[in-house]
Amino acid sequence: MILDKIFEKTKEDLKERKLKLPYDMLGRSLASNPFFPKDVIKALKRVEKEVKIIAEVKKASPSKGVIREDFDPLSIALNYEKNKATAISVLTEPHFFKGSLEYLSLIRRYTQIPLLRKDFIFDEYQILEALVYGADFVLLIAKMLSMKELKKLLEFARHLGLEALVEIHDKEDLSKAIFAGADIIGINHRNLEDFTMDMSLCEKLIPQIPNSKIIIAESGLENKEFLEHLQNLGVDAFLIGEYFMREEDEGKALKALL
């Protein structure tokens, strides 16, 4: 499965990064240049019919290959912010998504809205990295973590002042997210194991999610009417990447969905 390949490669990369910059040194770099994360819960919680979009900076994906040839992460991020994105998701996985932590750091320097580090996170070191490079919240994929691991990473993120978007794809993932104490739950219409899409997933899972949780819909979103349908089901915000990346003007495409 592709998820297993990505996970293994991420573990190799992390081992190298830890050798180059041990945990204590990474922590000291934060102490010398403190960063105070933004209130992600407040930003993402929907108010009436307001459309909230986490717009993604993504060059490639394992299922589609390179999506955006003329890829300028900062220009894209600034265009998103100018066109009223609620937050920006930054891919930092380098091999399959062609992302980088440097993109996250660069975008943080020039934007004011919350930033999501989107990667395959399974270690506290990666969460500390996210804070050092300027993220306000991190992605945690329920499918690739045990209940104990998910809970531990959630608690560590909060200890650092970060939030976590816990991504789910089925009832088992949802149970894991709820029992681990997730406040932000992302329902991914795309199955990460075979890339098939189930656009009815929100309808199936939202009735089982407590009202206190913030719900994010992910993948396959490119139609304003469908976004309104999902809002009526209880979705607070939408994470959209590939659709924007395929458009000539990603900011204009974003604005059209608001």
UniProtKB/Swiss-Prot annotation:
Key words of the record: Amino-acid biosynthesis, Aromatic amino acid biosynthesis, Decarboxylase, Lyase, Tryptophan biosynthesis
EC identifiers of the protein: 4.1.1.48
PROSITE patterns according to UniProt: IGPS
UniProt pathway annotation: Amino-acid biosynthesis; L-tryptophan biosynthesis; L-tryptophan from chorismate: step 4/5
GO MF, one example: indole-3-glycerol-phosphate synthase activity
Catalytic reaction annotation: 1-(2-carboxyphenylamino)-1-deoxy-D-ribulose 5-phosphate + H(+) = (1S,2R)-1-C-(indol-3-yl)glycerol 3-phosphate + CO2 + H2O
Biological processes per GO annotation: L-tryptophan biosynthetic process
Protein family according to the UniProt entry: Belongs to the TrpC family.
Name assigned to this protein: Indole-3-glycerol phosphate synthase
Provenance organism: Campylobacter jejuni subsp. jejuni serotype O:23/36 (strain 81-176)
